[in-house]
From Swiss-Prot:
SMART domains: OMPdecase. It is an enzyme of class 4 (lyase). GO terms for cellular component: cytosol. The active site is at residue 72. It comes from Xylella fastidiosa (strain Temecula1 / ATCC 700964). It catalyses: orotidine 5'-phosphate + H(+) = UMP + CO2. Homodimer. One of its GO terms (molecular function) is orotidine-5'-phosphate decarboxylase activity. This is Orotidine 5'-phosphate decarboxylase. Pathway: Pyrimidine metabolism; UMP biosynthesis via de novo pathway; UMP from orotate: step 2/2. Keywords: Decarboxylase, Lyase, Pyrimidine biosynthesis. Its EC number is 4.1.1.23.
């Protein structure tokens, strides 16, 4: 079942917290600490290595939270299709697949038998043009991102993961009805760390983002719940104030 329509998000579901922790115990501590400030959680590779990944997925679902499985699958089409077929049995809202191979993405969409929405990873926000050149791709990141977004759209994917810096170009190329989820969000006084193509909250939504993924700016805050609530307020303002 090709579920290529965008996921309908409530206004407080547009802030996705990156639950990048090494254990279920720490995951539950963060879920309890953030409370109603966060309704959508991304769980990735670090938790997978703990052996407690699907317990955390169940923990989130039982608390009424949306789940984003961020494992960035990249393999031959048959293998990725098999994984997606199994994941379709779980209460997952978003799941990522690398956007480097159109047949792999199409196989994944055809294997999806649930309301899970598949997102293509375009170019990691930790990568620069120089990084792409070292991989033999001598092009601007935005051009590669748009090309992969178009391929994902043609393959029936629901949307993409991309820097907010490229969201406007994606929206111009594809239009509405295609989800753009943006990591690499940085607020004032928060180090960029390994993120390169970063953007602020207001700019990301102005460029056409549907949702943002935030990890360290919340985890590193003196009061993480207050930081998350402040971001929710900024998102609401960005989505409701008239554009200039």
């Amino acid at each position: 079942m090709m579920n290529h329509t965008p996921l309908l998000l409530g206004i407080r579901e547009r802030l996705i917290f990156a639950l990048d922790v090494p254990s279920r115990t720490q995951a539950l501590e963060w879920i309890d600490q953030l409370g109603d400030a966060i309704s959508f959680y991304k769980i990735g590779m670090e938790l997978l290595a703990s052996g407690e990944y699907f317990q955390v997925l169940d923990d989130l679902a039982s608390r009424g939270k949306r789940v984003f499985v961020d494992l960035k699958f990249f393999d031959i089409p048959a293998t990725v299709a098999g994984v997606i077929r199994r994941l379709s049995q779980w209460p997952i809202s978003y799941c990522t697949i690398h956007g480097w191979h159109a047949p792999m993405m199409q196989a994944a969409t055809e294997a999806n038998t649930s309301n899970m929405h598949l997102l293509a990873v375009t170019v990691l926000t930790s990568m620069t043009r120089e990084d792409l050149a070292k991989m033999g791709i001598n092009r601007e990141p935005v051009d590669v991102v748009v090309e992969r977004a178009l391929a994902a759209h043609m393959a029936g994917m629901s949307g993409v993961i991309a820097s907010g810096q490229e969201a406007a170009a994606i929206r111009h190329a594809i239009g509405s009805g295609f989800s753009i989820v943006c990591p690499g969000i940085r607020t004032n006084h928060v180090p960029h760390n390994d993120q390169q193509r970063t953007i602020g909250i207001k700019a990301a939504f102005a460029n056409g983002a549907d949702a943002i993924v935030v990890g360290r700016p919340i985890r590193m805050a003196q009061d993480p719940q207050a930081a998350a609530e402040a971001m929710q307020t900024e998102i609401m303002t960005a989505l409701t104030e008239p554009s200039t």
